[in-house]
Amino acid sequence: MGNALSKISMIAEAFFAGFYVSITRGLFIPMLAYSGYPVRDISLVLVPTAIGGILVSSIVYRDPRLFESRFKRVIISSHVLERLMWFSLPFLLLSPPILSLAYMLANVSAALTSILIGAAVYSMFSGDEVIEVSIHRSAASSLSSLLGSLVMTYVSAAYTAPSSYYLLYFTALLVGLSGSMLLMMTPIPRSISEPRSSVVEEVKIRSGTALLILSLMFAGSNMLGISWSPLLKELGAPVYITVALTITGNVGGILGSYVWRGYKAYITAMLLNSLLTAAITFIAVPTYHIAVSFLTSLTFLGVNLLGMHVFSEVNDRIGRIRASAYLVSSNYIGLLAASLISTFLQSPSQNLILAGSIKMLSTLIALITIQEAAIVPAKRAYEISKIIYSTSLLGYSFTLQASRELLKTFISALALTALLLVLYILYRVALTLIGV
């Protein structure tokens, strides 16, 4: 009975989170695009966010003991902070540097929340229960996201900006905090203990290869998210068409949670998703994009389930927090790659074609490294995985170091901007006082 209640609580939390996420994330890029932000500026807003997410995942992975003794308390604190930070974003549209910083902090707290929620699922359930709960959480999230998308579409059509932005983000805040209250009553372990033994090479290789596959898929997905709204704007589509993409996308997410089963099905979904992404730029009728959104979401669920399946198999050997950190970091590595690429490619069409190509590369890697579904013998797939893991490890180390330096530079530049602003204000005040 207790285990059943735990499942219901975690699924219900995902339901509340889905509504809140569908509005805060689903509206953010369209909000920037229709506020006059070009693709390059949208990408620059996202770069510090990706860096922050990667660093948080790295810190959590390197020293999970920071969270073991106060596990539940940290989850709830991060859960609440994340929702408050996201609520602030529409009020900062006129100041891109401050918006970028707030967006980074919102995503840093979101990254930590996602890692710890994932670790909680791994801690509360085992084996097939993890997959079962994850599938139901995904479906519940997609269902409530659909409701959120309907609300978002109606409000966007009924109210003018920025009033519609304020109303939607405030509604999302209230629903999101309802999920936080539910989480307080959920029997999550107050503390957990992670394994201290070294991880065997085979597990490292499997985890590292999965990280690369997921990172590439998320890079393509984030490039799609960055470029789709600007493409529709070029086609002359009204904003409610852009918002409506999330409605059909959420319907696809609900069905996709139950369509894909097993590694072969996951990779089939990845292949279809890659082809669909590359085809978007050639669809000239805006309303057709709504149907494509359904199909891309339906197939992308296979990617999420592949990641969850791999790390549910290895979490007892690398630790629940570390397994979850791996899973979450792939999204932020993908976001960083997508943001940097989109900074240099100004054309939404070029971005979408490249996004499809990156997803196809990820699919090909999965086809030759995931032993359960590889098109080569299992032994050969392991050897290829080992080579790819060694290569990608160097790339990840470089990315991590570069992220640290870029984050330092960003914070320094922001501090300098703030200092100059303060000096200018003092200068104007002084002129006023002396009557000049």
Q: What feature does the model see in each segment?
A:
Residues 154-174, 343-361, 402-414, 429-436:
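A membrane-interface helix-boundary motif in multi-pass transporters
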Residues 173-192, 363-373:
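C-terminal membrane-cytosol helix-exit motif in multi-pass small-molecule transporters
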